[in-house]
Amino acid sequence: MTSLPGRGVSPSSSDPLCEGNAAPSSSSSSGQDLKQLKNSILSCVFSSPFSIFEAHQDSSANRSLKPHSGSYAWSRFLRRIACTGSMWRFLGASKALTSSDVWFLGKCYKLSSEELSNSSDCESGNAAFLEDFSSRIWITYRKGFDAISDSKYTSDVNWGCMVRSSQMLVAQALIFHHLGRSWRKPSQKPYSPEYIGILHMFGDSEACAFSIHNLLQAGKSYGLAAGSWVGPYAMCRAWQTLVCTNREHHEAVDGNGNFPMALYVVSGDEDGERGGAPVVCIDVAAQLCCDFNKNQSTWSPILLLVPLVLGLDKLNPRYIPLLKETLTFPQSLGILGGKPGTSTYIAGVQDDRALYLDPHEVQLAVDIAADNLEAGTSSYHCSTVRDLALDLIDPSLAIGFYCRDKDDFDDFCSRASELVDKANGAPLFTVVQSVQPSKQMYNEESSSGDGMDSINVEGLDGSGETGEEEWQIL
C-alpha cells in the first residue's frame, strides 16, 4: 500500500525536530538562540500529545540551513536520543492527530497527558499502546520460499495481501488463546514454546499448518490461486476448509493435532458477495463447540469470522460507527480490510482513522523451527502504526472475534445485540437463538434443524463448519 501523506502540517513550521530541519538559521549566534532551540525541542517532545503514527515529511519542509555550531551540536545530541529506537515514533509532523482515545483490539488507551480517565477499561500512556501494537504478529509479503504447489511462484508480492492479513488475524486469535490478551513480546530470549510454535505455524512452506501454500490449496474451490487476489469471503471459507482438513488428518497444530478452537464462519447469503446482514445463531455456535469437543456438552473456545459487504463502490457511511464499536469489544480480533485492492489488518481506531498493520512490505522468507526458542522473530513484529480514513475502506471486509468460553460468548452476544439496537435498521450482523428448519440447507451428511427464533432470516445464511457438516441458512 502506498504511504499516506502527512496531514495538518505547515511547511513553514520552525520546529527543528517536528519539521525535520537540522537546526535554526545561523543569522544569530547568541546564547538566546541556543536557549530557544532547547525550549523548542523540549516543547516538541513534551508539551503536545504524542504522535504515535508514521509521519510523512513534505520534501519542501527540508530546507538547507547553516546552523550555529553550538546549537547544532545540541540538536544533534537530542536528535540522536529521540530518534533512536521506538522513541522517534512519538515525534513527527502529524500534529493534526488528536489526543482522543485509541481503541485497539478491545483495549482503550489514553494518549493525552491530561484528564486521565479513572475507568478501569482504559490504560494511560503512549508507551503502553506502542508495546501492545508492536507485540501483535505482523505477517507480510515474503520472497524466496518454495514454489507454491505446481506454480512457479516463490513470492506473494503484489497479490498475497489478503492472505497475509487473514494470517495476522488468526495469529492474534492463537496468541489470545495460548498466551492471553495481556501478553507482550518478551525483550529477552529464550521465548516461550507457545509463541515460537505459533510463528512456526505461519511459516512459508507446506510443512507449516497455516502457510500461504496450504491456505491456497484449501481455498481452491473458492477461487484462491497463486498470483490472484482474493476477497474476504473466500478467504474466510479457505480458513474453514483448512481447519477442517487439519482436524481430520490430525496434523500437528496445537500439540494435539487440532486447531485449538471451534471456527464459525457467518455470512449473509450463499456466495457472500451480495450483502445482507449475517445472523450469528447461538444454537449453531453451541453445536460447533459440541462437535469440537467430540460431542461433549462443554463449551469450547470459538473463533467467529464475519464477512460483510457494506456498500457498492464505497463503504456506506452509516456503518462506520458500528465498525468502530466492534473494535471496542473485548473479543475483537480486528478487521480484514483496506483500500480497494489492498488488504490490511485493521486492529484499532482513533476518531475517524483506522489503525492497521500493513502486509505490503517485502521480506525474505524465514524458517522458524517449532522447538527453536532462540529464533530471531523481529520480522514478525512492527512498531510503525499506520492509519487510514475509515470512509476509504473497501466495503467488502471481514470482522473477527475470539470467545474463550461460554461466558465470553454470552458477553459478545449481548454487546452485538446492543449494537443492533444502535443500527437504525441496518445492522452489521444480528444474533438469534435458533433458526427456522425450513430455511436451512444441509449437505448430504447433515442432521435435522432447530426451532425458529422470532426474527425473519429468509435470504440470510449463517454457516459454520461442524466437524464434517456445514450449516447454511438461505
From Swiss-Prot:
Heme in keyword set: no
Principal subcellular localisation of the protein: cytoplasm
Organism superkingdom: Eukaryota
Active site location: 161 (nucleophile), 358, 360
GO CC field: cytoplasm
Function: Cysteine protease that plays a key role in autophagy by mediating both proteolytic activation and delipidation of ATG8 family proteins. The protease activity is required for proteolytic activation of ATG8 family proteins: cleaves the C-terminal amino acid of ATG8 proteins to reveal a C-terminal glycine. Exposure of the glycine at the C-terminus is essential for ATG8 proteins conjugation to phosphatidylethanolamine (PE) and insertion to membranes, which is necessary for autophagy. In addition to the protease activity, also mediates delipidation of PE-conjugated ATG8 proteins.
Family: Belongs to the peptidase C54 family.
Name of the protein in question: Cysteine protease ATG4A
